[in-house]
Amino acid sequence: MSSRKHLANAIRALSMDGVQQANSGHPGAPMGMADIAEVLWRSHLNHNPQNPEWADRDRFILSNGHGSMLIYSLLHLSGYDLSIEDLKNFRQLHSKTPGHPEYGYAPGVETTTGPLGQGITNGVGMAMAEKALAAQFNREGHDIVDHNTYVFMGDGCLMEGISHEACSLAGTLGLGKLIAFWDDNGISIDGEVEGWFSDDTPKRFEAYGWHVIPAVDGHDSDAINAAIEAAKADPRPSLICTKTVIGFGSPNKQGTHDCHGAPLGAEEIAATKAQLGWEYGAFDIPADVYAGWDAKEVGAEKEAAWNAKFDAYAAAHPELAAEYKRRVNGDLPAEWEEKANTIIADLQANPANIASRKASQNALEAFGAMLPEFMGGSADLAPSNLTMWSGSKSLEANDFSGNYIHYGVREFGMTAIMNGIALHGGFVPYGATFLMFMEYARNAMRMAALMKVQNIQVYTHDSIGLGEDGPTHQPVEQIASLRLTPNMSTWRPCDQVESAVAWKLAIERKDGPSSLIFSRQNLAQQERTQEQVADIAKGAYILKDCEGQPELILIATGSEVELAVEAAAQLTAEGKAVRVVSMPSTDAFDKQDEGYREAVFPSAVTKRIAIEAGIADFWYKYVGFGGKIIGMTTFGESAPADELFKMFGFTTENVVNTAKELLA
């Protein structure tokens, strides 16, 4: 049987070889954390390489994702479907081993990491999901949800502000199944971190309410093992502070930034292997090392034991077991489609002129009763975002059976935590803040789009309609920024019906995030036929039309739709042939077939005006260079909303005059 050190050296060898073959990458962190990884993966991690989707597996996250050869080596050695050829293709086009770990490529990669700090934050979300799912489904004698979340993170993760947001909340909520390892190697790209990172990290985490295990030798297997055992036994989240040597084993580069982000070079690799006693060539792993690492048999036994436990649970609680399966499979309730469509039809039949943020809350009230998988929240703005409904129950450290998270003023942390909740499974997470403060969270929403995970964001107070709070709180360019993000679905509804449709589609969308943008001010409900209600889902549809071919098309979203309707009525009375298109979602419209898009926007009709209280430039795509845009070209001002709309040209008079100029 190979020694622990010999098995850990397999990680070091593969990491050196992979980075050298790619001629780029980060060998230092994998070499430094290899001993920790060997103890965790071989003695503690419950997983099954033959079924990476096993619901009750432990989750492992490499938050310092630049050290990706570490996780690729672990997955390969443990027996996942990741071959030695895949490792040789590290960082190559269309490989399963991209430069940073990406969800959906290599089996066993739980989340995409690389932007530092987001991995630990995803881990907080996964641990929250585990604790909530356990509270909702476990019954006496039947702990079917019972797994840990393990996170490796480096100095960079801890320097990023998001780590404070997430780890603070993790301590407050008592996430005892979360165990993080700090790779305390004292090195970052610029050199020794003591010049820019001198925090007392153990005291920092003690202040959060974490269980802290300081000064663990990251190259002493017995010390690492004892620390993990202590962490698993403590009811608080745990930070294991492991002192490591970056690039461990490299005679000339270990302990320096020279081994952080570049290949070691052929000579140094040879010297390192000699020093480690590793007598094998590039990508050469001997049979005894593979045998020592192989987790397939043990993993299958662990899953089989859990399956037997679940069968007993299903016999005792058949309805709960069926509901658990539905939830973790991500299936909607059987009656969902029919009931949701009825709710939308009823809203159209019973008009209400309300703010779309209130319409959003009403949609939550209607849909929430059918969706126990909802896990809502807000970044300390629930009374403004209107994200709580009658069925909302807040999560508390001692009671996680609820469905609502008070994230505090942590927009970035909230959004990345939601990514972790979505990745874990069993929940449909939604969160909220003012649209302006989407900026704090932008990269986490980009990560949701990149990973194709369901993350529903409610962004309220969507324009200069916010009024007196002024330009610091008035969004201008934010909607365009969201629309320009690949795989982001963005909706800005004009009334309660469009709001409910947007919510329905966001709930049904499993392959990416949704941004639902709502107003502070009341909006007039529009009249629609049944066919028009059905067409809302297409992203843009003809709301008001003329006889025959229009000479002018007015395009509007959200609060500006009623402005377009009023202007069209006045122009029609003056003999103009005008069409009004409500366009709540440009990305949904862009996915429609050419026939539908041509029917809404005939190419022969070039006189077009877009009206939106957001950045104007975005709309040239739809109006063309010959069209006009009534939008924002500057930041807002502090004043009552009515005065601002008038000042910036969002009036019936200005729309009519602009139309006449265009038609002249």
From Swiss-Prot:
GO terms for cellular component: cytosol. The active site is at 411 (proton donor). Substrate binds at residues 26, 260, 357, 384, 461, 469, 520. SMART domains: Transket_pyr (SM00861). InterPro entries: THDP-binding, Transketo_C/PFOR_II, Transketolase-like_C_2, Transketolase-like_Pyr-bd, Transketolase_bac-like, Transketolase_BS, Transketolase_CS, Transketolase_fam. Coiled coil: none annotated. Keywords: Calcium, Magnesium, Metal-binding, Thiamine pyrophosphate, Transferase. The gene is tkt1. It comes from Aliivibrio fischeri (strain ATCC 700601 / ES114). One of its GO terms (biological process) is pentose-phosphate shunt. Binds 1 Mg(2+) ion per subunit. Can also utilize other divalent metal cations, such as Ca(2+), Mn(2+) and Co(2+). Binds 1 thiamine pyrophosphate per subunit. This is Transketolase 1. The record marks 26, 260 as: Important for catalytic activity. Catalyzes the transfer of a two-carbon ketol group from a ketose donor to an aldose acceptor, via a covalent intermediate with the cofactor thiamine pyrophosphate. Mg(2+) binds at residues 155, 185, 187.
